[in-house]
Amino acid sequence: MTKCNLPEVVVTGVGVTASIGQGKEDFASSLLSGRHAFDVMKRSGRQKDSRFIGAEIASLSYPDRLSKKMLRKASFSSRAALVTLTEAWEEAELDDADSSRIGLVVGGSNFQQRENFEVYERYQDRSGFISPAYGLSFMDSDLCGICTDQFGITGLAYTVGGASASGQLAVIHAIQQVLSGEVDTCIALGALMDLSYMECEALRALGAMGTDKYADEPENACRPFDQNRDGFIYGESCGALVIERKETALRRGLKPYAALSGWSIKLDGNRNPDPSLEGEIHVIQKALERARLLPEDIDYINPHGTGSFIGDEIELKALRACRLSHAYINATKSITGHGLSAAGIVEIISVLLQMKKSALHPSRNLDHPIDDSFHWVNEKSISYRIKNALSLSMGFGGMNTAVCIQNIEKCGGES
């Protein structure tokens, strides 16, 4: 391999499952064409007295390597995790790696609220018939257990929760585990958060989730950074990244996707959903500092961009304060919806695939940007080779995270 002055940590495998496609090729194709799956949600346990708009996964295709018995007992979130992890695992050729040197960090919590609520409704008057398997599956750690069981991971595994920043928290933890030497390879998995209508009602009452304003035209509901936005629109998704040191990747003969060159976490000391301008500025600046990048080095931003009334405004103010309004910017959630715990990883995957395709996807429904001085990618995808990207995630409870992603296309060939 050629010797390159790369940052220490790289991505060697990617897996993604979302409403717009299972697998990175279908996902990338949908992103670049702006193809979406927004509709009034129909999955059992999601509708009652209100109409909630979202982007649901139509079906899952299961690889042969997965245990059919395990799949029958697993929750929907766990099944999505297994198929997503399989794609990343096989691309990174981890069957040949030492399983005791592989770790797994799962981003998220409360993964199966919809199924939990259905269990309650079904068995509230006959609790003696509840399956013993529910004693395992209602715990978040069961998702770790299922994945480590199926793939023989014996290094480490745990979950990290940070609301909608959970995915990026998992990525940062995975980076730290690799750099500490605890494991050689660590998988960050953003798990599918399976909402019931109860969570949808509460999030709508909180003013976070979109109303039924667009129920008769669901394709127009998800509109981050647009003046007519109406709150976030939920989108089922799951993403996985295989993260390792560059030396490990090159020794194993792998060509990395990109380097994770900088990252930061900052708390606001606030349990409410309110965003913090200071917190967002802090993580942007610290991530750039760790990556040894200047603001002008960033040429693409993948923002948190949910379509919330206050959050979108604050995020653009933070980017402007950090002198980043020159960079191209688009909103992945305008196509995928908001994956909540999975969003941070799914959006880093969006960055990696746009790097690979040398193209930027459009932002749907960005008819009237709240600030048209930014360098928006609007109605159509464009050809562009990203050099340095910044991805942001924020979560309820004062969570702010940022990750810098460096294109290393010229650093992976044979010498």
Swiss-Prot record:
This is Polyketide biosynthesis malonyl-ACP decarboxylase PksF. Residues 6-407 form the Ketosynthase family 3 (KS3) domain. Signal peptide: none annotated. GO terms for molecular function: 3-oxoacyl-[acyl-carrier-protein] synthase activity; lyase activity. SMART domains: PKS_KS. Belongs to the thiolase-like superfamily. Beta-ketoacyl-ACP synthases family. Its EC number is 4.1.1.87. One of its GO terms (cellular component) is cytosol. PROSITE patterns: KS3_2. InterPro entries: Beta-ketoacyl_synthase (IPR000794), Ketoacyl_synth_C (IPR014031), Ketoacyl_synth_N (IPR014030), PKS_Beta-ketoAc_synthase_dom (IPR020841), Thiolase-like (IPR016039). It is an enzyme of class 4 (lyase). It comes from Bacillus subtilis (strain 168). It is found in: Cytoplasm. Keywords: Acyltransferase, Antibiotic biosynthesis, Cytoplasm, Lyase, Transferase. Pathway: Antibiotic biosynthesis; bacillaene biosynthesis. Involved in some intermediate steps for the synthesis of the antibiotic polyketide bacillaene which is involved in secondary metabolism. It decarboxylates selectively the malonyl group attached on the acyl-carrier-protein AcpK (Mal-AcpK). It comes from the Bacteria. It catalyses: malonyl-[ACP] + H(+) = acetyl-[ACP] + CO2. The gene is pksF. GO terms for biological process: antibiotic biosynthetic process; fatty acid biosynthetic process. It holds the Pfam family ketoacyl-synt.
